[in-house]
Amino acid sequence: MSRVAKKPISIPKGVEVSVQSDMLTVKGVKGVLTFPKSDNVNVVMDGDILTLSANDPSHISLAGTVRAILSNMIKGVSIGFERKLELVGVGYRASMQGKDLNLTLGFSHPLVFVPPEGITLLTPSQTEVVVQGIDKQRVGEVAAKIRSFRPPEPYKGKGLKYAAEAIIRKEAKKA
């Protein structure tokens, strides 16, 4: 069996998990998340412990994937997820206009990004953007979408980068 799927999930206080025949629902302080349940994976709830197992040896990897997704759902509705982005470059700025993100990235026009449902954007400073939400996948997708407007270039390092990202720099061409 998958090492990931073998590890049981403990449910923290304030989080409710309901297992139906075709759907897994996780309710918490921050919101509600649902995930379609596969018939090939058994989910057993014993008090505040969830255990997963595969029906067939060929579905062991699926059990590990479902366990990781379920664990992230529980963490999301209790704590939440966030991704931080930094703007590096002269004149690169970020500001909030209501719920929309206004980006000045050296183009002839400012970029306006409207966040999808369930995602909160914050700008603690003009050179920082924080993406928050309860769904880990959507937070990552939105952060990647914002970063794609001006990814960091390797010569000067200008652009939008993740806070912990290390940009591999290239040396300029010598004459």
UniProtKB/Swiss-Prot annotation:
Ribonucleoprotein recorded as keyword: yes
Protein's GO biological process: cytoplasmic translation
GO molecular-function terms, A-Z: rRNA binding; structural constituent of ribosome
Coiled coil residues, start to end: none
GO cellular component, one term: cytosolic large ribosomal subunit
Keywords: Ribonucleoprotein, Ribosomal protein, RNA-binding, rRNA-binding
Gene3D superfamilies, per the entry: Ribosomal protein L6, alpha-beta domain
Xref: Pfam families: Ribosomal_L6 (PF00347)
Oligomer and partners: Part of the 50S ribosomal subunit.
Family recorded in the similarity comment: Belongs to the universal ribosomal protein uL6 family.
Summary of the function given for this chain in its UniProt record: This protein binds to the 23S rRNA, and is important in its secondary structure. It is located near the subunit interface in the base of the L7/L12 stalk, and near the tRNA binding site of the peptidyltransferase center.
HAMAP family: Ribosomal_uL6_B
Protein name: Large ribosomal subunit protein uL6
